[in-house]
């Protein structure tokens, strides 16, 4: 998960840009961590396929990391 610099001093524009990228960042990170193709990601997302404990832990870690990134991004504006 890459960390981007603040693109502007515009809170709304910056957080919007970050959130628009969230689904792609989540998918790409889960695929990388789990060793899946994009097709496997969507097949598992739409089906009732079971996840291994390792996959479950990686999916949760990716989600937590992305949420932390957005929280950290918004906190940069709180100190201004």
Positions of the model-derived regions?
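Short acidic DE-rich linear segments
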Residues: 74-80
């Amino acid at each position: 998960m890459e960390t981007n610099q603040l693109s502007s001093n515009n809170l709304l524009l910056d957080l919007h840009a970050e959130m628009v990228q969230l689904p792609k960042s989540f998918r790409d990170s889960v695929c990388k961590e789990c060793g899946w193709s994009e097709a496997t990601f969507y097949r598992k997302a739409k089906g009732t396929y079971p996840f291994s404990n390792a996959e479950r832990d990686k999916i949760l870690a990716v989600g937590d990391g992305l949420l932390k990134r957005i929280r950290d991004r918004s906190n940069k504006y709180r100190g201004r």
